[in-house]
A protein has these predicted regions:
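Glycine-rich ThDP/TPP pyrophosphate-binding loop and its adjacent helix/strand module
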Residues: 1-177
């Protein structure tokens, strides 16, 4: 992309646990050295499956991991869709302008288990913590924001849900019947 003079930017996503893998460091270092137009987006829900972040890294933030590669790192409230959009938009513009990559750490929360194969989050997270994060649910926050701006209502939501019900059922059926 950079070599061709395009303003395209590569996006890569990983979780907090992924930042402790060698491939992650190699990718950030390579991109930093060659000023590759790339965004490294890290979804930090505080756990690598069930291992707390404090038990997997000494870094105070995951955004700091970019510093050694000469890459700017920024932390954003991953539960705020508008904040994530703004930070991503600015980082994309930075990378597209030839300034090199950016690492974005989104502070977020995983409500359910990491996998469906026996991961029980109640073993490592408290009910109080879950309830606290529920108050910051991005869907509820966006609904409230749009409602306050007069752009959304319960009637609009109900109509949309009714409109897409069959489409969602069809997608689920296709996924259930998909050969892997």
């Amino acid at each position: 992309m950079k070599k061709n003079g395009s303003d395209e930017v590569a996006f890569t996503y990983t979780g907090d646990g992924g930042t402790s893998q060698g491939d992650f460091y190699e990718g950030v270092n390579f991109a930093g050295h060659f000023k590759a137009p790339a965004l490294f987006i890290v979804q930090d829900n505080g756990f690598a499956i069930s291992v707390p972040r404090a038990s997997q890294t000494a870094a105070k933030t995951l955004a700091q991991k970019a510093v050694a590669a000469g890459v700017p790192g920024v932390q954003v409230d991953g539960m705020d869709a508008l904040a994530v959009y703004e930070v991503t938009k600015e980082a994309r513009a930075w990378a597209a302008a030839g300034n090199g990559p950016v690492l974005i750490e989104t502070l977020t929360y995983r409500y359910g288990p990491h996998t469906l194969s026996g991961d029980d989050p109640t073993r490592y997270r408290s009910k109080e913590t879950d309830e606290l994060w529920q108050k910051r649910d991005p869907l509820i926050r966006m609904r409230n924001y749009l409602t306050d701006k007069g752009l959304w209502s319960k009637d609009k939501e109900d109509a949309l849900i009714e409109k897409v019900k069959d489409e969602i059922k069809d997608a689920i059926n296709k996924a259930d019947n998909c050969l892997l």
